[in-house]
């Protein structure tokens, strides 16, 4: 009988100057969180290097009905083996969503549908609202369960800071939302 352990967990790295054609190591980081999610398994850590990740309209992860999701997290970890998306050491990653402005559609910067995920230590800025009426947009919307959203700063946008619905047993710890 072979049982997986924490020793089986891998580390992936994402950096503003990375490439999704690279291996995702500290020396050859990926460019996108979506590619890192594709490669990550329960128990893995995605280290996000400091700098500005400038989201472009052609990098939108998903458009569904009246929503555009810039970053869509649908893959889940497991109990005791969350997938971690953490800022690397004391570095400050910033996800600038200000250039994503599809007309007449709601924009969610981080759409979290998966469970057993842990996000820590980065900023989300510039999320837009592009139409009048019920034009709600969100910096981070969580539908999953057993997630930890920790030390995020969601600011200087037109969107709701954090919107949590449907899921259960989530922890929102030391997050800030302002100038939204």
Locations of regions flagged by a protein language model:
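Beta-solenoid repeat scaffold
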Residues: 41-95, 112-120
């Amino acid at each position: 009988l072979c049982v997986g352990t924490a020793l089986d967990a891998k580390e992936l790295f994402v950096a503003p100057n990375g490439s999704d054609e690279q291996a995702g190591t500290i020396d050859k980081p990926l460019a996108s969180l979506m590619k890192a999610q594709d490669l990550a398994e329960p128990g893995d850590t995605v280290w996000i290097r400091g700098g500005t990740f400038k989201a472009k309209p052609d990098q939108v992860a998903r458009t569904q009905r009246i929503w555009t999701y810039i970053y869509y997290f649908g893959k889940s970890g497991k109990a005791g083996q969350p997938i971690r998306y953490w800022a690397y050491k004391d570095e400050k990653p910033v996800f600038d969503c200000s250039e994503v402005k599809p007309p007449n559609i709601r924009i969610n910067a981080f759409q979290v549908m998966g469970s057993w995920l842990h996000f820590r230590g980065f900023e989300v800025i510039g999320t837009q609202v592009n139409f009048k009426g019920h034009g709600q947009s969100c910096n981070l919307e969580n539908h999953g369960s057993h997630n930890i959203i920790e030390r995020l700063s969601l600011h200087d946008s037109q969107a709701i800071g954090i919107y949590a619905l449907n899921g259960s047993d989530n922890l929102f710890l030391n997050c800030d939302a302002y100038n939204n």
